[in-house]
């Protein structure tokens, strides 16, 4: 079976002239000669990027998905290829509704007419992984509730595993034969896609993502997220609250309904930066197909988020990296940008900060020929990542995913309001983050988090130091790396504790002095 699939892939490559694209990048002389023979006498009207998109479409939904994921790696691909792959649509004909009903009944352990008052047999949406039916719940406290039922396609795993095995083989050969193979790391890209695809095959994971996002925005008048019904959800079936709205792309319809379009554009950016800098958890598939706007009088003009299969998570370190880079960029402090890359630990130790600074200046300085409101933060990140790649900087996958999402959000915002000033909207979030991290509040919050661990580990520090000294005396060259790392970790924790105690003590002391002055002023001593 795999051999036939492989033959089809080879013929597709030749049919769309992708061997011509490969020819210029292949190093092996024999393979290069073979490719020259296959390209004799052929002419193609479409550019290579378009031919790649069409080839992936002809190979089926799994390769379409791969192209979509590949389009997010703008740090690896030329701009024209990334833009063309972003046009790939994950739309396939629906599977038989009788099969969908059978999957629901098997997964939930009851007949469809016992579970639902109504179940629309014609799906409202169909993609490569699942399709969606509208229904109404029949039982319990949610009786009569309108829901959307997402059903996983049957027998997907064998197809996916077969195609992934071929992709791994192709990636291995590409890494050996292609001039850019090592730099582009095709095996890592396929491994990333493997994880992403298998995550999508578990609808409980998507439900958990949606539930987290809903909880994060509870009480904020910004974003509506459907409620997940856990009693009706399994890895193969997801039942969530049905929400209806107007697709964000239908701007004329929204304007005619009375929606404030410039406000909508600003709030879209606010939602994104709230997810990034407050929550460290963001919806990473915010294209127009997954975003609607409510016209319900109760929630008029609010965003509705759908499809939670792809999310990103950021650590405090990631958020600090982003905030400081953006602030340094807009101050044109390229030395600081270069230093931040070195401090991240993702740069080879022999990298010269002056060379990195010069390269960053060369790609960033041209942005300042335009107004601040016209600068794309996503493009800035993309250029920084591309420059970093030349210095063998290992850009973290979550930051690449964030950059792709940021481009989507910017495109969405500017399609609504071409005058949208992204920097004006983003700057307060960046400055608030830095204030909270560096200021007294940040120290206090970190002290609360770390205090229990410190109280447990601090008493062990003298023993660890003693052990290290004894070991060094008995075998000067035999101190284990693990022990050294452990000592350094404890030392850093101790330093943080002492710093926090110092700040806390200064704050208490300052408070006491101020209180004393107020008493003197009020009562005359």
Swiss-Prot record:
| A Gene Ontology cellular-component term | plasma membrane
What InterPro entries does this protein's entry cite? ABC1_dom, Kinase-like_dom_sf, UbiB, UbiB_bact, UbiB_kinase
What keywords tag this UniProt record?
A: ATP-binding, Cell inner membrane, Cell membrane, Kinase, Membrane, Nucleotide-binding, Transferase, Transmembrane, Transmembrane helix, Ubiquinone biosynthesis
Regarding the membrane, this protein is recorded as: Single-pass membrane protein
Q: Per UniProt, where does ATP bind?
A: 124-132, 150
Citing just one GO molecular function, the answer is: ATP binding
Which EC class is the enzyme in?
transferase
- EC assignment: the record states 2.7.-.-
Question: Biological process GO annotation list?
Answer: regulation of ubiquinone biosynthetic process; ubiquinone biosynthetic process
**Top-level lineage group:** Bacteria
Entry-linked Pfam families: ABC1 (PF03109)
Its function, per the record, reads:
Is probably a protein kinase regulator of UbiI activity which is involved in aerobic coenzyme Q (ubiquinone) biosynthesis.
Record PANTHER family: CHAPERONE-ACTIVITY OF BC1 COMPLEX CABC1 -RELATED, PROTEIN ACTIVITY OF BC1 COMPLEX KINASE 7, CHLOROPLASTIC
Please identify the protein, giving its name as recorded. Probable protein kinase UbiB
From what organism does this protein derive? Burkholderia mallei (strain ATCC 23344)
- Name the gene that codes for it: ubiB
